[in-house]
Design a protein with these regions (language model features):
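Residue-level detector of flexible, active-site-proximal loop/helix-junction positions
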Residues: 88-90, 110-112, 128, 178, ...
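Helical hairpin unit composed of two closely spaced alpha helices linked by a short loop
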Residues: 140, 147-149, 154, 165, ...
């Protein structure tokens, strides 16, 4: 599963107010569309949905010419959109549930609503620590549905939780040549460390300039 953070030079993903549009360039956003098009599913959280009302779909006009040649408009397949929503906060008002293609809500209890699109629920237990969905069981359920390539776009806490559970196969970071300052929101949120030996380590798989930004692809060393 691939996790995507977008960052400034000082490792920030948004201002303290939550403003993040746009830290990175149009070239980086086009590159993200290319990755989305290749994924079986896109995974995000109810917190991201409520904060940004994102579409989390593939926009053909935003793809590179190379990817357009592989995926003609008439045969474009939308990845399944998956939202962790343990508190049933996502409603039919959000665009992610209204667009073409399948949308799955990973919840701990069912709540029937009049969805406009192809929306269904996956019911899972909590993780035992808080009221959040058990992410390991979620990935197992997705595997049973033959959803094997999951592209993650979320905030720092969810990305950190996936990393600590060993559920990230690749971490892709787009770094913009900007500095957002001390009060801005961080890249990843993980448990406090008591020594440097506990710090997660990575292997740099690739480093590429995308427009004015840098894309770093990292493999966790679990």
């Amino acid at each position: 599963h691939d996790a995507l953070p977008i960052s400034s030079l000082d490792g920030k993903t948004a201002l303290a107010s939550g403003e993040s549009q746009w830290i990175t360039s149009n070239a980086s956003r086009q590159d993200v569309q290319n990755f989305r098009a290749q994924a079986s599913a896109i995974l995000t959280t109810s917190a991201t949905v409520l904060a940004d009302d994102p579409a989390m779909n593939v926009r053909w006009e935003a793809l590179s010419d190379e990817i357009k040649a592989i995926y003609p408009l008439e045969s474009l397949r939308q990845p399944i959109r998956i939202i962790t929503d343990s508190q049933n906060r996502v409603t039919p008002d959000y665009k992610i549930t209204q667009l073409a293609g399948e949308c799955l809500l990973a919840r701990t209890h069912s709540q029937q609503e009049a969805w406009q699109g192809d929306v269904s629920e996956i019911l899972l237990p909590t993780n035992g620590k808080n009221s959040s969905v058990d992410l390991v069981l979620l990935m197992m359920q997705l595997g049973k549905r033959n959803i094997n390539s999951v592209w993650v776009e979320s905030g720092a806490h969810f990305a950190g939780a996936l990393l600590e559970l060993g559920l990230v196969d690749e971490l892709i970071i787009y770094i913009a040549p900007k500095i957002l300052g001390n009060d801005a929101r961080g890249l990843l949120s993980i448990s406090p460390l008591s020594s440097l030996s506990e710090a997660p380590e990575f292997t740099i798989d690739s480093l590429q300039q995308i427009g004015p930004d840098i894309r770093v692809c990292l493999k966790p060393r679990y």
